[in-house]
Each structure stands twice: as structure tokens, then as C-alpha cells.
């Protein structure tokens, strides 16, 4: 039973075995070795790139093509040039490689060597006859591609030696195509040969490269406008892909099929450059109109004999027209090219002067296109379109291109077009916001125009030139103004507000623009302004209620002087209204304890808008003429005089005005606000700009650096000053009481005390950059000292962008003696000023050394000297030192507040203030002895010298920029080389990996043999088992 069961199982196993996969395997294994066969050319290129000359020679003997090119058109010689393999280059050239063979982009080996900067290869190739005037597909010669100076020099010398005309070389292809097209047209037979790889025709090349003359001639000769290359591309595909608008227009005018697709189903719209998609859509609409008109013409079934005759005559006329216009083309082709150059130059100029936004330009170009459409089209039309002129489209014969202008089409002038259309629409083509903003570049304005002035000016500008200037943008030069007027005559008005550029610290663009404005506009000189002021002083020796003073808009200097001179009493509570610097008036003048004659009061400080705009040629003058609002806090009565509003706030004793609010208000008139920067950033920027701003006329670089150092020191000491602030105030109160008692003794001692207090308050103000309002009693001395400090702070903030100071050259001689005295008095004053931090005194000295005008720093003894000098002058003695002092004092007190904006130059305001309070008669006596002409000549000479230095500095800066650019370019090239080295290393690593893989592949047959042996053994075992089972 057991044996029967075993046999049955074995039989079942055998049944399963028969027909199984293993049983179906043949008993003898077929061993077919599959080999990868490479193209001979690919093997040759690989051998060349590896540098194996023996292998290359074997392949050449076997019949390999030495000029074999890969898919990119690169030959072995190209690759050797790129790899910097000089030996292989020489080997290939010696073995007959074509030295001028181009790749798919038209690059010959010399292009590759020039691009990589391999001098030795380039020299060898040139020596072997490489063509230095060879042009690639983009019209670049090896000289254009060369980056390193040595390579450029080598190629340029070779071009000069061979006498190659580069421009002629660029146009060589177009010239040859024109010649062939004319031959085909004259012979009536087209002998074109398609490109071997792409199947492209002459029409494809002319369309892709924008050879419009060739394109017209080929179409005229009877070329099919819808001809396809091997990829199914039509000439319209090529023209659209390469963005050639004129070529697209010519093809569409000749009724090419715009819906044709290439082999991958793309229309011309799918492959078109983004820039001309809209233009293609417009052309399609135009073509649809033409087709519908043709259908309308063909609708009559019966044609009269007259129409037939017309058609016959039209055909003959077409032939005649061809004969007539053909020589015109030959003769005037050069003219057309010159005309195109002129057009491009005009476009460049228009780009510079363009100040409108892109939307405005579109509207502008559309309106122009409409006017152009209404002009009669003097082109010769076919019989089909001769009767329908109502539509603004004309179909021309193939000879004459349509004069139709569309909103986005830049149209060059061709000699065959009958209508002449201005290419103004091309402005938009290369235009970016950077280019059109250059037209109205905004200089860093240091004082914004008043709202009133800006609105009036804006209205005036709109009425005249159609351009709205921003408050700080310079007037355009006369040439730009003329262009704007020309635009207006065409019926276009362009509104533009210059972009708000943050204030910059004397950047090169500012300097250049200011120099331009200096040359294009006449300026009112400083001596003129001062003499005008001097005349006014003589006229107004008594109190003059309604007097107005003209002042040059280039120096915004009268603000503090006018305010200080119009304080008639020591206990007054003045409120100064400043309608953005256009109106200043003192509203209240209460009890008078000391009667001092002043030059003006109330309305005497008004300066009308017309006077403000007195020297309106220069925008810089406009800017400087607008002083910042002045804030005068007086002990019990705090007055915040912000722009255009007068605020009178009565507070109790001890109220301190909000200095932060004052500063906010003041800054709002100093810096034009940018939309994208936050309020805190804007404040910080404007404060920094005010502190270290320099003028274009009188500040030297050393002055600016010293000023910045001073500001740096003041910031470090600011925290300490705040800690000592309360102590200072207590000290001041005590001193105020003492001065009140001393005041009763004599006027002279009281004035001395004023000066002590004034100079101290002055220094504190300088340290804190904001007005200090004392909360003490309402004594005259406290109110005056507080007012003077606030005036000083406002003059700091109102630093105008004008002549920074009279020259440092002549002022140093005047002030040297006084400086020495000031340093001695510093030590004596230590006992008095113990409450003040040491940093104040330390900072006072460098400021004193930076003075630009002849006003000495105030000390008690020097003030006594001044009083002695003044009395000497009144008696009639004219000592030299007294004269110079009176000159400098007079300039300080009379020119205007801007002369004392010297927060950077460290001048004492108490000096000029007290000088204002003295009678006019004594000052006028001193004024008579001054020689303003000599001073003016000195200033002028110094300014010229500084301008020359500035110009030299600018030149050096531009040179440095050029060197920097060259250096960065070199670094980029070095980076490219390192990248190339990395690629080489990667390639070597990959080659090693390939060789390892090949070794493993060699082991593969052994493994297969082992596998087969095991299979055979398995089959044998199975057979043995099956026999045993039986």
C-alpha cells in the first residue's frame, strides 16, 4: 500500500513537471553576446577629448571625419579650445581640421578661445589663418566676446593689421542674401537650398534675423510665405520666436496663415516672444479685416467688362511698379539704415527726457496712432482694396509696405513706404522706471517747499509745461523743457510727480545735478544779498512797521535774525508764526523794561511769496528759501509755532513744552516722506541728514568729518547729560535769581550775565538737539535765555543747503587771537560751571576751532573787549582788529539766520543777538568801514577752488568705480574658471566610475556561466529523482 501511494505521488509530480517553465528550457544554452556600438564620430570626439593622439590617428586612418560635429555643432577643435588643450589643438590643425568651422550658434574655434581667454590658443589659431572678422548668429565677432584686456588687445591689433571692417562683417550675411534675392527676382527663378539639418529656407533666415529688405524681395520673387522647415516651422514662427515685429507685419500683410502649427502642434502665438504677443493679436485682427473685405469684394457673381479691364491695367501697373521701385531700393538702402540710426538716437533722447508713467505713454501712443490713421495713406493698393478706404487699414502691393501704425508697433522708416510714421512708440520698448525717472531726478532736498508755494508752483507748471514738479525736484534744463513743449504741441499732457528719494549725504548724483543747475541758471551772489540787506538797514534806522526785505532764495538765513531783532523787550512773550517760512510775525509785546531800538517789529519780518520766488531759476534756491518752523517756548507761556498755524498755549509755571512733538512737527517740513519707510526710520534718517549734511558751495571734506566726529561725541555724552539735567535746572534758577538782583545795579553787568546764561543754554541745546524750556519764574533773563535756546535749536534744525560759511581761510586769521583768549577763559569758568558735565566744555573747543566766519566764541572777557571796541568805533578810531570784528559781527547779525545755522561750526548765537539789540547807529558806523567787494572776491575765489576740488574728486570717484567694476568682472571670470575645474574633476571621477562598472561588466559572463551550470545540475537532479520515483 505504501509503495502504491509513493508511485502515485511521483506520477503527479511528473505531470506537473511536463510543460513547466524549467522543462521548456532548451538543453543547449544559446550564448549571444550583445555589444554597444557607438558612432565612429562619437568615438573620435571621445578620443580627442581624452587627449589620446595615438587612438585619434588610428581612427583617422580608419576613415573618421576630423570635422565631425556633435548635436550642438561642436567639432573636436572646438572642444580642444574650450578645454585649453593646446597640444590637441595643434595636432588637429596639423591633421587638416577646418579652422573656421562654425557650430550651431555660428561660433568658430577662435570665438571659443577668445571667450575663455586662452591667449596661446588664440595666437596659434590666428597664425594658422583663423578669421578674426567671423560673426556668430548674434552678430558678435571674437573681439566682441573677448573679456580680458590682453585678449582684446591681441584681437584688435590683428583686426587693424588685416584691415577688417567689423561693421561690414556684421552685415555680410544680409548683403549676400540681398544680392541673391535680387538675382532670383530678376531671373524669376528661386535657386534656394534648404539647410541640411533644420530644413530652413532663406525666408526663414530673413524672418528670424529681421532682414526686412530681403524678406520683401523674397516674397516679391514668389516665395511661399507659409513654407515649412523640417520641424514644421513657418517664417512667421521664426519671426515671432525671435521678436521681429517688422518681419511679422510684412508676413501678415502678405496674408500668411497665422494658424499654421508645427510638428508639435504649436502656432506662431505659442512660440512667440512675450513682448510681441499683443502685437501679433492686433495683426491677426487686421488680417481678419482684410479677409472679410476680400470676401465682400468677391461676392458679386457677374463682373462687368470695365472691371476686367481695370484688373488687366492693374496687373501691368504692378509690373511697372516693380521695375520702378527696385532701383530705388538699391539706391536708398544706405539712407534707410542711416535713418534708422537717427531714429534710435532720437529714441535715446526721448528715453532720457521721458517723465511719464507707462500708462500715460500707452495713451499717448494710441492717440498718435489714431492721428496717423487719419492721415491719407499714399500707398498703391490692389484693385481689391481700391474702393474701400473707409476702414483704417490699407493692403498694399507686395512692393510697398503698409504705412499702418498700431499702438504697440515700433515702425522704422523704409525708403519704399509712402507714409512717414514717427517711431515715437519705441520709447516703451526699452523703458524701465529707472530710465524715465532719470528725466526728473530728485535731488536730496534740505528744506521742503511750503504748501502754498507748492500748490501755486504746481498750478503754474501744469498750465505751462504740463509737468507737475514735486516740491524738491529741480527744474528741467532748457532742452528738456523744449521737448516737453513739443510733446504738448502734439496734444499730450504728461503729469508726473518725481519719486521721493531719501536725503543723501552729498552723493555723486546730487553733486552732478547741482553742477548742472549751476551752469544752466543764474545765481544771486552773496555780496548782492548782503548789500541789499545793508541798504535796507540804512533805510530803516527807525522802527519801520510795514517794511519787507527781499532776500536771495539761495541763502535761507534770515529766520533767527529777524526773530531775534524783533524782540523789543526782555519780558515779551513772542509767538512766531511761520507759514512754512513765508510769514513771520510777533504777536504780543507786553511791558518794556529796557528800551532798545530794533530794526523791525510785527509785520517787518514778512517776506511775501513773490519775494520768496525771486530767484526761481534755481530750484536749490527755492529749497533753501523755506526755513523750518520756529518754536519759542517762554517760561509761563509756551508757544509752538508750527507751519501755517499759530498756537498760543498758556500754561502754569513749571510746564515744559513737548520737545518730541516740536521735533516731529519740525521734521515734517524737512524731509519728503517716502511711502515705504516707517515713521521712526524717516525720523532717524532726517535727523542724521540734518546733523551731517553738507552744502555744495562752501563745506570742505575736513569740515564734514570734524562735524561727524563732534556728533559722535555728543551722542556718547547724551546719557550723562540727561542725568545731570535736573541739577542744571536748579543751578540755572539760582543764577537767574542772582542775575535779577544784579540787574538793578547796572545794565552792563546785566548784559554780561545774559551772555553767561545764554552761552550755557546754547551749549546744552547743542548737546540735546532740542529746545530746553525752563520752568523757573517769569524773569526777563529766564525768558530771554529760554527763547534764545529754542531759536538756536531751530536754526540747527533749519540748516539750509547753501553757502556753509564764509571761507575758513580768512576767518582763521581773524579768530586766532580770540580762540586763545577763549581757551584761557575756559579754565576760569570751571568754578562757575561745575554743574555742567565736562563733555560740554570739551566739545565746545573743537566746535570753536571749526568756525568758518570771523565771529569769536563768546567768553566774559572777550565780551568786555567787544564793548571797548564798540566804544572805540563810535569815537572814531579805526583799529584793524576792531574793523574785522565788526565785519564778522555785522555779517552774522545782518545776512540772515542761515549764517548761524552753524551747529556744525560752533558759533555763539548770543553774540549776534546782543549785537541786534544795540542801536542801529553804532552798527551802521561800523558797516561803513567794511569792504564787501573784497570779501566777496575772496569768497568767490575760495568757492571756485572748492568747486575745482569737488570736480577732481568726482573724476577720481568715477575712475575708482570703473576699476571696481573691472575687478568684479575679473573675479567673476575666476569663479567661472574654478567652476570649469570642478566640472573637469567631476568628469574624471565619473570616468573612473565608468571604468569600475566596466570591470564589473567583464565579470558578468562568468556569473552567467555559473548560473547556467547550476541550472543544468538542477535539471540533472530532477531527472534522477524522476527516475528513482518510477
From Swiss-Prot:
Changing residue 472 to A: Abolishes phosphorylation by NUAK1 and interaction with 14-3-3. GO terms for cellular component: A band; actin cytoskeleton; centrosome; contractile muscle fiber; cytoplasm; cytosol; focal adhesion; kinetochore. Coiled coil: none annotated. Its main location: cytoplasm. The modification Phosphotyrosine is found at residue 446. SUPFAM superfamilies: Ankyrin repeat. The keyword Cytoplasm applies. It is found in: Cytoplasm; Cytoplasm, Cytoskeleton, Stress fiber. One of its GO terms (molecular function) is enzyme inhibitor activity. Residues 385-402, 469-480, 564-610, 643-660, 773-795, 903-913 have a biased composition (Low complexity). InterPro entries: Ankyrin_rpt, Ankyrin_rpt-contain_sf, MYPT1/MYPT2/Mbs85, PP1_Regulatory_Subunit, PRKG1_interact. The modification Phosphothreonine is found at residues 443, 696. Expressed in striated muscles, specifically in type 2a fibers (at protein level). Residues 682-864 are annotated as: Interaction with ROCK2. A motif (KVKF motif) lies at residues 35-38. Residues 291-300, 318-340, 422-432, 481-491, 614-625, 673-682, 718-767, 814-840, 914-928 have a biased composition (Basic and acidic residues). Residues 290-628, 643-928 are annotated as: Disordered. One of its GO terms (biological process) is neuron projection morphogenesis. The keyword Phosphoprotein applies. Phosphorylated by CIT (Rho-associated kinase). Phosphorylated cooperatively by ROCK1 and CDC42BP on Thr-696. Phosphorylated on upon DNA damage, probably by ATM or ATR. In vitro, phosphorylation of Ser-695 by PKA and PKG appears to prevent phosphorylation of the inhibitory site Thr-696, probably mediated by PRKG1. Phosphorylation at Ser-445, Ser-472 and Ser-910 by NUAK1 promotes interaction with 14-3-3, leading to inhibit interaction with myosin light chain MLC2, preventing dephosphorylation of MLC2. May be phosphorylated at Thr-696 by DMPK; may inhibit the myosin phosphatase activity. It comes from the Eukaryota. Keywords: ANK repeat, Cytoplasm, Cytoskeleton, Disease variant, Hydroxylation, Phosphoprotein, Repeat. It is linked to Genitourinary and/or brain malformation syndrome: An autosomal dominant syndrome characterized by multiple congenital anomalies including urogenital malformations and brain abnormalities ranging from agenesis of the corpus callosum to anencephaly. Heterotetramerization is mediated by the interaction between a coiled-coil of PRKG1 and the leucine/isoleucine zipper of PPP1R12A/MBS, the myosin-binding subunit of the myosin phosphatase. The KVKF motif mediates interaction with PPP1CB. PP1 comprises a catalytic subunit, PPP1CA, PPP1CB or PPP1CC, and one or several targeting or regulatory subunits. PPP1R12A mediates binding to myosin. Interacts with ARHA and CIT. Binds PPP1R12B, ROCK1 and IL16. Interacts directly with PRKG1. Non-covalent dimer of 2 dimers; PRKG1-PRKG1 and PPP1R12A-PPP1R12A. Interacts with SMTNL1. Interacts with PPP1CB; the interaction is direct. Interacts (when phosphorylated at Ser-445, Ser-472 and Ser-910) with 14-3-3. Interacts with ROCK1 and ROCK2. Interacts with isoform 1 and isoform 2 of ZIPK/DAPK3. Interacts with RAF1. Interacts with HIF1AN. This is Protein phosphatase 1 regulatory subunit 12A. It comes from Homo sapiens. The lineage of its organism: Eukaryota, Metazoa, Chordata, Craniata, Vertebrata. The gene is PPP1R12A.
